[in-house]
Amino acid sequence: MDSAQIQKAVKEARTLAKPRNFTQSVDLIVNLKELDLTRPENRLKEQIVLPSGKGKDTKIAVIAKGDLAAQAAEMGLTVIRQEELEELGKNKKAAKRIANEHGFFIAQADMMPLVGKSLGPVLGPRGKMPQPVPGNANLAPLVARFKKTVAINTRDKSLFQVYIGTEAMSDEEIAANAEAILNVVAKKYEKGLYHVKSAFTKLTMGAAAPISK
């Protein structure tokens, strides 16, 4: 599956989606084969930096206090301080809303025990447990990386679907992002892309377009 084949599928996916009054996302769908995914070592659990970026902003929440909280606030990130964290632990509905609204979480390392107790039951199943950082960390590089990152966690399922851009991006940009994900799949398994049964691209409101092998 090279860039030209992926670009062809992206072009087809565009034709299969009716115009909408919002910018549609583009996803990559991958079906895996001949893998025992009940074995943890065969599962894909990766964070992948998309070379072309995501084409949209990613909301990031920082669980912190003191200087780190102030730095996060200056960067326009969502800040969750200790008292708010404790309240979220008592309000599962609010905790779920926070979890669903944010793509990634960063937490001051010495607050991780409280994070685990208050938000762990909500963030854990979503694969969004925070990245711990020291209280004097420079958040800028980590935030920049997260804004270009997507997460894959197949668990025991042979199919995964992952965001690779928006319809406003060029076919080349979207294809480069898809290639980055397929390269991770290829490196994960000894037989590489042999384990990909099929792959597709799809816009939010459109049908899936197959990527030729």
From Swiss-Prot:
Xref: CDD domains: Ribosomal_L1
Keywords linked to the UniProt accession: Repressor, Ribonucleoprotein, Ribosomal protein, RNA-binding, rRNA-binding, Translation regulation, tRNA-binding
Gene3D superfamilies hit by this protein: 3.30.190.20, 3.40.50.790
Signal peptide: none
GO cellular component assignments: large ribosomal subunit
Record-level GO BP terms: regulation of translation; translation
Single GO term (MF): structural constituent of ribosome
Superkingdom, natural source: Archaea
Subunit relationships: Part of the 50S ribosomal subunit.
Family: Belongs to the universal ribosomal protein uL1 family.
Task of the protein: Probably involved in E site tRNA release. Binds directly to 23S rRNA. Protein L1 is also a translational repressor protein, it controls the translation of the L1 operon by binding to its mRNA. Thus it also controls transcription of L10 and L12 by translational coupling. Unlike the case in E.coli, where the site is in the untranslated mRNA leader, this site is within the L1 protein's structural gene.
Listed name of the protein: Large ribosomal subunit protein uL1
Species whose genome carries this gene: Methanococcus vannielii (strain ATCC 35089 / DSM 1224 / JCM 13029 / OCM 148 / SB)
Gene of this entry: rpl1
